Design a protein with these regions (language model features):
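Class I SAM-dependent methyltransferase Rossmann-like catalytic core
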Residues: 3-24
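Class I SAM-dependent methyltransferase SAM/SAH-binding core
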Residues: 43, 49-97
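Conserved alpha-helix/loop element of class I SAM-dependent methyltransferases that forms part
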Residues: 21-38, 55
Length: 269
């Protein structure tokens, strides 16, 4: 039996808003790392609300086709409202992509972001992505390595809070350090010309996006609150104090955050 995945952040309306903000902050930076030939066929696995999928479709240009696969009912319903002949969304699972027979091995690009960290068997998901990719096509994986978060000056209690957040991933079988492993996963799946890169996902006080950035940070931690406390990774008082200090930090004129999003690319031959 293929192990199921667990999405730590939940699927409530607040999480959908957070994901929209996250896309606004990050999509353009990620697009700058991607080179597409005109009219490319693109598959986005774990497409969520479809905002990045739509960006990929626009970048591909006239004659291109972009297919987003997402398993969550609410997210796929919202994404499908933006469908066009060149942009399609389907409900499906990363372990068993809902592809037609003539779509197997037909995509120029397979893209996946913020998916593998939530899967119990990322290698199996990559195998399925490569099944969809044509020979000579490129797979692009982007994901977190949570140990890379740096806040300056560090709010009191943040280190324990962030460690508890990381450990909450581990308690449900997810991988908070998947980002550093992406090149190895591609090599283990037979990819060639494997390369690694980073997208800077930091910010600082005074930036026009800092408020949205820190809102995303505090909300993503809050999604794991119950899991952290139930597993005694942090006490309720320690959590409340650290979150209060984090909010205070966001008001500092020199508050600075550094965080890299890990990328790995490879080709199928």
């Amino acid at each position: 039996m293929i192990p199921l995945s667990t999405y730590i952040h939940g699927i409530n309306p607040g999480e959908q808003i957070r994901l929209s903000i996250l896309n606004e902050l990050l999509n353009q930076r990620c697009l700058e790392k991607i080179t597409l030939k005109p009219a490319a066929r693109i598959l986005d696995v774990g497409s969520g609300l479809g905002l990045m999928t739509e960006c990929l479709s626009k970048k591909s240009g006239p004659g291109g086709y972009c297919l987003g696969i997402e398993r969550d009912d609410e997210q796929i319903e919202k994404a499908q409202k933006h469908q066009t002949p060149e942009l399609e969304f389907r409900k499906g699972d990363a372990y068993q992509l809902p592809l037609k027979e003539d779509e197997i091995g037909s995509f120029d690009i397979v893209y996946s972001r913020f998916l593998l960290e939530h899967l119990s068997d990322p290698k199996r998901a990559i195998e399925e992505m490569l099944r969809a990719l044509k020979h000579g096509g490129q797979i692009i994986l982007s994901d977190d390595d949570h140990q890379s978060m740096i806040l300056y000056p560090e709010p009191e209690g943040f280190q324990k809070l962030w460690t508890a957040y990381i450990d909450s991933y581990i308690t449900i079988g997810n991988d908070p350090f998947i980002g550093r492993k992406l090149p190895r996963l591609l090599l283990d799946n037979g990819c060639k010309e494997v390369r690694n890169d980073l997208v800077f996902f930091g910010d600082m006080a005074g930036s026009p996006t800092f408020e949205a950035y820190t809102k995303n940070l505090s909300e993503v931690i809050a999604t794991a609150r119950n899991l952290m406390i139930e597993n005694e990774l942090i006490s309720p008082d320690e959590y409340a104090s650290a979150m209060k200090n984090l909010i205070t930090w966001t008001k500092m004129s020199h508050a600075t955050a550094y965080y890299p999003l890990c990328i790995a690319t490879g080709k199928k031959f």
